[in-house]
Amino acid sequence: MTFTSAIKQCYHKAFTLRGRASRSEYWFFCLYLLILCFVLVTIMVFMDSNLQDDDSGLVPNLMGLSILLSGLALFIHIVPMFSVTLRRLHDGNMPGWLLLLSIIPVGNLILFIFMLLPSTPGDNPYGPNPHDEEKKEYEWEQQ
């Protein structure tokens, strides 16, 4: 799975809580969100440092706008991230309720380890192996 296809699939399956997500789909989407956060923070720092000496009152308005847009971007990506994490747990043949581990501090470390685990080979109760589907798509594209 490529970087762009993983992002497209995460948005396409944002409200799909069934099925499985491969490691590449999950980690490419995490990388995309990390890049997005980096860009948003860079814009906010740039605006703060370049407009600090402005006495027009524009700076608080622009900072407020950038904080609002950053919050909106975060809000928009909560559902796809929740969905792909749940489907990633399914890929390891684990129930989705394990996502609730993120509520406790050490639970995030446990979830991180679960996200690193390889897929369950073959089909499991949550659906077919996503690697098999990726191989079929790749073979079809090569023809």
Positions of predicted regions on the chain:
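Solvent-exposed loop/turn segments at secondary-structure junctions
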Residues: 33-34, 105-108, 133
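Membrane-helix interface segments in multi-pass membrane proteins
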Residues: 37-78, 142-143
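A generic structural signal for secondary-structure junctions
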Residues: 44, 48, 105, 114-117, ...
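A short hydrophobic/aromatic micro-motif that marks alpha-helical segments and, especially, helix-coil
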Residues: 37-38, 108, 120
